[in-house]
UniProtKB/Swiss-Prot annotation:
Homodimer. It comes from Ruminiclostridium cellulolyticum (strain ATCC 35319 / DSM 5812 / JCM 6584 / H10) (Clostridium cellulolyticum). Belongs to the alpha-IPM synthase/homocitrate synthase family. LeuA type 1 subfamily. This is 2-isopropylmalate synthase. The lineage of its organism: Bacteria, Bacillati, Bacillota, Clostridia, Eubacteriales. Its main location: cytoplasm. The gene is leuA. It is found in: Cytoplasm.
Length: 508
């Protein structure tokens, strides 16, 4: 009989630690809703004590999501565990996830604790967590570099103290598949009470082995896999959820394992996370990359045309990457538009639908065909970013033998503010004018433009990242006019920075 594994998604916690990623509350909620549709078993919403924002997002997920376990990470420290419980207590299925490092190098240089002190701390904090919550996960940080006999003792002791899941992380992506699989097997064989808890794994990708190590662990008895959408995470990232799941699905003959994931929701989850984090998916990324199902070689093309399975071991449709459906145009009504949004996985408020529909009608006047990708770009552009400043109008004068100038008018409440500026090209001039009009000085650290669809009337999507007050803020803008898309993106990022930091950053 096939074993069933659990998928623990940490996109909103470990994934958000990707450099330059800073999700707000509404964006986290949108991603979490998609993760529920995807069918993950556990969502780690954040690190409750790390910041008020993390605490609020975990509590919001706990109050709003059903059919999924909500977890908060916490150190093996009393105040951390107390705060984690405050955040997850309203969840239908709450989990406290506590950790402490167990490797010699971490104990000596980071914790400055002995093995016995670490063991005692781990046990006492699991007991404290268990006093709040029946579902407690314990992680032995840097387990793959921990002395195995000590690791067995820690795992046995925390299970006895009440841990229902024990996580074995490859924290620095140091292990190899054979080695990591053997470690999981050794834990099963050397921890007497291991049958009273689920074995979980959390693999990092520093050597490009996170997915391979995770699958090796599953093969050797791991019950839960911790992963992120698109493999997001600090340094080289985490094991990619989509690669683990499709590896298991494609090789059912080998793994004989089941799970709850609806694979047709994978591509939508990947695009949503990419859009809201501003982290592009590489074209040759397995499963969800733009080239994942592309065939350029003549021999390969001939084979696929004759019989798809000659070169395709899975179908685009199996991960929700079907052909674009060209179903809406300028004569489409709001009802049809709203139905299409629901089919695409969006759950928007009436006001958000109204705003998105207005943008859709405006785009439909400029484009012959509006595709699903266009709609995604329109909706994702302004998810949950308060419009403190709104573009009223802009004008550009630019050429190869003149200084580029821009005049931008923005609206704040009922006031229209107009400013002009010069710059090195039309985009720079427009950004300088936006800064003068808003009174916010920022440093542009990233600018990217891409065509959402094909053709001369394609929608252009601009992503910018600005640095303000030692934080990075992302903005997105879409338009058939790339200058307008750029202005929208820059203003979007400025609005986000004001929302996060406060209006004190606006110079008078």
């Amino acid at each position: 009989m096939a074993r069933t594994i659990k998928i623990f998604d940490t996109t909103l916690r470990d994934g958000e630690q990707t450099p330059g990623v800073n999700l707000n509350l509404q964006e986290k909620l949108e991603i979490a809703k998609q993760l529920v549709r995807l069918g993950v078993d556990v969502i780690e919403g954040g690190f409750a004590i790390a910041s008020p924002g993390d605490f609020e997002s975990i509590m919001t997920l706990s109050r709003n999501l059903k059919g999924v376990t909500i977890a908060s990470l916490c150190r093996s420290v009393e105040k951390d565990i107390d705060r984690a419980w405050e955040a997850v207590q309203y969840a239908e299925s709450p989990r406290i996830h506590t950790f402490i490092a167990t490797s010699d190098i971490h104990m000596k240089y980071k914790l400055k604790m002995t093995e016995e002190e670490v063991l005692e701390r781990a046990v006492s904090m699991v007991k404290r967590a268990k006093g709040y919550c029946s579902n407690v996960e314990f992680s032995a940080e840097d387990a793959s570099r921990t002395r195995e006999e000590f690791l067995y003792r820690v795992v046995e002791a925390v299970i006895k103290a009440g841990a229902t899941t024990v996580n074995i992380p490859d924290t620095v992506g140091y292990s190899t598949p054979l080695e990591f699989g053997r470690l999981i097997r050794n834990i099963r064989n050397n921890v007497p009470n291991i049958d009273k808890a689920d074995i979980s794994v959390h693999c990092h990708n520093d050597l490009g082995l996170a997915v391979a190590n995770s699958l090796a662990a599953v093969e050797n008895g791991a019950v839960q896999v911790e992963c992120t959408i698109n493999g997001l995470g600090e340094r080289a990232g985490n094991a990619a959820l989509e690669e683990i799941i499709m590896g298991i699905n494609t090789r059912k003959d080998y793994y004989d394992i089941t799970h709850r994931i609806d694979t047709t929701q994978i591509y939508r989850a990947s695009r949503l996370v990419s859009s809201l984090t501003g982290v592009n998916v590489q074209p040759n990324k397995a499963i969800v990359g733009a080239n994942a199902f592309a065939h350029e070689s003549g021999i390969h093309q001939h084979g696929v045309l004759s019989e798809k399975t000659t070169y395709e071991i899975m179908t685009p449709e199996s991960v929700g990457m079907g052909t674009n459906r060209m179903v809406l145009g300028k004569l489409s009504g709001r009802h049809a538009f709203e139905d299409r949004l629901k089919e695409m996985g969006y759950s928007l408020s009436d006001e958000e639908v109204k705003t998105a529909f207005a943008k859709f009608k405006d785009l439909a006047d400029k484009k012959k065909v509006v595709t699903d990708k266009d709609i995604e770009a329109l909706v994702d552009e302004n998810i949950a970013v308060p419009e403190i400043f709104v573009i009223d109008s802009f004008q550009i004068n630019s050429g190869n033998k003149m200084i580029s100038t821009s005049t931008v008018s923005v609206r704040k409440d009922e006031e229209i503010i107009t400013e002009a500026a010069t710059g090195d090209g039309p985009v720079d001039a427009a950004f300088n004018a936006v800064e003068r009009a808003t009174g916010v000085n920022a440093e542009l650290v990233h600018y990217r433009i891409k065509a959402v669809t094909e053709g001369k009337d394609a929608l252009g999507e601009v992503t910018v990242k600005i640095s303000n007050n030692n934080s990075i803020f992302m903005g997105k803008g879409v338009s058939t006019d790339i200058i307008e898309a750029s202005v929208k993106a820059y203003l979007n990022a400025i609005n986000r920075s004001i929302s996060e930091i406060g209006e004190s950053i606006i110079s008078q």
